[in-house]
Amino acid sequence: MTKKLHIKTWGCQMNEYDSSKMADLLNATHGYELTELAEEADVLLLNTCSIREKAQEKVFHLLGRWKLLKKKNPDLIIGVGGCVASQEGKLIRTRSPYVDIVFGPQTLHRLPEMINSVRGDRSPVVDVSFPEIEKFDRLPEPRADGPSAFVSIMEGCNKYCTYCVVPYTRGEEVSRPCDDILFEVAQLAAQGVREVNLLGQNVNAWRGENYDGSIGTFAELLRLVAAIDGIDRVRFTTSHPIEFTDDIIDVYRDTPELVSFLHLPVQCGSDRVLNLMGRTHTVLEYKAIIRKLREARPDIQISSDFIVGFPGETTDDFERTMKLIGEINFDVSFSFIFSARPGTPAADMVDDVPEEEKKQRLYILQERINQQVTAWSRRMLGTTQRILVEGTSRKSVMQLSGRTENNRVVNFEGTPDMIGKFVDIEILEVLTNSMRGKVVRTEDQMGLRVAETPASVIARTRKENDSGAVVYQP
């Protein structure tokens, strides 16, 4: 009988990536198949996020429901991972003693051994250590699930923003070696992946080791990834302004595979509040980055994160944020009311902004962002957009669906052979959450690079000199 695994994931794209790796790992080692139903699982894993308010209570609420399943099936294994697990550690078992495994983001690769231990002597396991980049050496080969894929290139963060728990839950920055990343991307490309999203808490801080022992830069990595046959669209998430260097901007100038869309969080438009947040950059420095980006790539769209109601934020500070939003003309962005995370410096600050004022500021900010998003979308009406076709539309089985470079969902009439490929679509209608269009060009008509195998390159470049010796001309 097939053993079943259920994974519940909360939080960022890094958590989504980690959960997919857990599923692949436990399938390879124990034969577990994923199930959407917790009731039929042999192992339940909760991959948690500690960014939002009341994250811990959300975890224990779900665990309370899983406790009932364990009463019915005493052999059921329950594991809690992610950032809340890293933060709380043994306290999770103190409050929920029926939890068998507590593991952190850096120890998920040890799950097979943890499960074996619990199965063997029924003793619980708690491991929330930080064994650097070891987890990537222990994970199975990637498995593609559609034409887009996430690839983690680094873990942790050294920036220690005063409101953020990431350095405490995921550790400090550790970069994967360049060859490891390129090999994973090449494996995904061989399985039909056309778009990769490079992940890291501070992705542009990547400083991985090259094959010769030298240290590479993020700009160099972007060019290498974009050069892999089959990969025709490259994204990255999330970056920090302090390390958004000119060499990265140059990649936008000369690498068309890099999308014309960037998520670059600024958090606030007031230098005074940015200083309280520990952001180490000014508004002027942020605006200078955007100006250079738009010189290199005039059509680029920018998204951001915003925190409103940070301790000490005045009406003037908030108005400066609103001014910056208008000046940059941000596209889709993410905004939140400040909530103190335990153990961070901001948790010790006086939270002096009234709750109603926070809600009002959030409403005003989101309304402005939504207006700008609508305006950006309307500008696309009548234009031709390159779409990566993901599959059948949710709205109609008679239509296909894909995404633009700026993440707009576009539905259109097409043929099944277009799935997993690029098509150029004329935008005919802009709706609230999607767009509608018609095909004007298929991938065969685009002149994209033709993938070549090493054997075909050797055959094409093979020559014989006057003495009959075989030489190869690159």
Swiss-Prot record:
Domain of life of the organism encoding this protein: Bacteria
Protein's UniProt keywords contain tRNA-binding: no
Necessary cofactors: [4Fe-4S] cluster
Enzymatic reactions: N(6)-dimethylallyladenosine(37) in tRNA + (sulfur carrier)-SH + AH2 + 2 S-adenosyl-L-methionine = 2-methylsulfanyl-N(6)-dimethylallyladenosine(37) in tRNA + (sulfur carrier)-H + 5'-deoxyadenosine + L-methionine + A + S-adenosyl-L-homocysteine + 2 H(+)
Keyword set includes Metal-binding: yes
Protein name per Swiss-Prot or TrEMBL: tRNA-2-methylthio-N(6)-dimethylallyladenosine synthase
Record-stated family: Belongs to the methylthiotransferase family. MiaB subfamily.
Cofactor note: Binds 2 [4Fe-4S] clusters. One cluster is coordinated with 3 cysteines and an exchangeable S-adenosyl-L-methionine.
Span of domain MTTase N-terminal: 3-120
CDD domains attached to this UniProt entry: Radical_SAM
Binding site for [4Fe-4S] cluster 1: C12, C49, C83
Annotated signal peptide: none
Organism field: Enterobacter sp. (strain 638)
Subunit organization: Monomer.
Domain named TRAM: residues: 378-441
